[in-house]
C-alpha cells in the first residue's frame, strides 16, 4: 500500500475471572503500546512502506472466549 490507510484492530484477550465474552477490557496493556508493536511488525512484514501511512485507527480491547487479534486494513481515498 502506498497511500494513507485505515487500521481496524480488535485485541481479544482470554476470558478469565468475572469477565464475560465480548466485555471491553479496561486494564493493561495500554492500546497505544499494543498498536506500536503491531504497526512496527506490519511495516516489517511489508503491509505498507511506513507506519506513518496509518491515517485512521480504530482500536478495541475485549475479553473473548476465542482469543486473538482481528486486523483489517483498507486504503483511504481522498476526502471530497
Regions found by a protein language model. Give the residues of each.
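Acidic, proline/glycine-enriched N-terminal capping motif
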Residues: 1-80
Amino acid at each position: 500500500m502506498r497511500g494513507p490507510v485505515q487500521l481496524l484492530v480488535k485485541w481479544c484477550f482470554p476470558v478469565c475471572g468475572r469477565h464475560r465474552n465480548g466485555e471491553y477490557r479496561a486494564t493493561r496493556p495500554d492500546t497505544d503500546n499494543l498498536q506500536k508493536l503491531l504497526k512496527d511488525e506490519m511495516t516489517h512484514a511489508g503491509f505498507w512502506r511506513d507506519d506513518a501511512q496509518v491515517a485512521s485507527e480504530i482500536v478495541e480491547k475485549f475479553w473473548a472466549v476465542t482469543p486473538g487479534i482481528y486486523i483489517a486494513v483498507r486504503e483511504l481515498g481522498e476526502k471530497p
